[in-house]
Amino acid sequence: MGNLRLESSPETIVGGWGFEEDILTALGEADKLVAAEGNQFWFTGFYDQLPGVDVPDPESLELVRTDDWSLRTEVLYELDPDLFATDPNRFISYYGADGGDISEINDSIGPFFGNASRRKRGDDWPTWPGGESYAYYDIPEFVSRYGALLGKSETAAAINTLYEQALQEMRSRVPPASDRPSVGLLNAQINPDNEGFFRAYNPRTEIDKAYGKKQYRDLGIVDAFEGEYDGQSGIQVDYEALLEVDPDVLVFHFGVNYRDWNGEDALRKTVEGMRDSSLGQELTAVQEDRLYVGGSAYQGPIINLFQTEMLGKQLYPNEFGEWPGEITAGELPEIPEGEQLFDREELAEILTRASEATGSQ
């Protein structure tokens, strides 16, 4: 991420896959976004519950890559953004750029400011520009660093205070391990009908600061497949493997994203296929209707707050209150005010003040 200093506040920004966009939203800077790496993964549905908070339509943002994952360098030059709020090494690892390409973009278009901390980086992860491995950051550290860069340190401090206090309160409600249900964490889009298998994720990560599965870590998920991953982040499983461990609960990771995927509700297809399957109907989670929409892995402070609250209500209703949503409803429910676990009004006030400050710059 480095120690970048800007001569003036950026007017145009390229984002990432939703994480960076959520941080920019928290700091009142989202209206400066002109492009992204993966706009389909920026889930904006939670912002609807924050009065006065507006963000760009993710589909309005240019993509910096082609459908076959090549960098659209000519588009970057046309956009001429003031800042790339993303890790340049993703451009190398994902889109086929090399160090020379990144140096040219950095020098000719705009600087990079980002850090790939969603999950553990692979052994072959690039290390531009210094050639050395670099640190991971947690969500509050990202907020503070972007806040300092964009002249929003006071906003960053307010966001982090609310965020950390709310998470502490939610973590304090988690029941003892003996009272927690076992959980299978499945990809919301991959299923036997389209791939021949389900994909079960390991909810734990080797990096404590990684944000991709943070809510599962914070709420002490009891993993039905613990010990089965052999060092991998996920495994392929069929109905027989699911029935062997028979989780009390099934959570469909990325479910909020896959509800609207290329014009289709991929989550609904996965869930309805399971409910229609004779083997699926033998699963305890299906019989007891404990199938739940899971969150996005691309979560900054705002999205993570909502997703942690959501998961707590899904797994531990006695301690967190009931989750009122039906998984195939097509939209997320609003939690009644008396059952909310963090203050929406306070959060919205911080965000709208930050946006007003941005507009007056």
Describe the residue ranges of each PLM region.
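A short, structured surface patch at a secondary-structure boundary
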Residues: 17-111, 221-224, 257-261
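Alpha-helical, coiled-coil/dimerization segments enriched in small aliphatic residues
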Residues: 196-233
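Acidic/histidine-enriched, beta-strand-rich ligand/metal-binding domains
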Residues: 56-61, 226-237, 241, 245, ...
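Sec-exported extracytoplasmic/periplasmic mature domains
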Residues: 18-19, 25-29, 78-81, 89-90, ...
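Extracytoplasmic substrate-binding proteins
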Residues: 3, 100-196, 294-357
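Loop/turn elements at helix/coil->beta-strand transitions in domains of secreted/extracellular proteins
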Residues: 11, 29-33, 80-83, 108-113, ...
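Extracytoplasmic low-complexity, Pro/Thr/Ser/Ala/Gly-rich segments
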Residues: 1-22
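A local structural motif
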Residues: 3, 7-10, 52-64, 153, ...
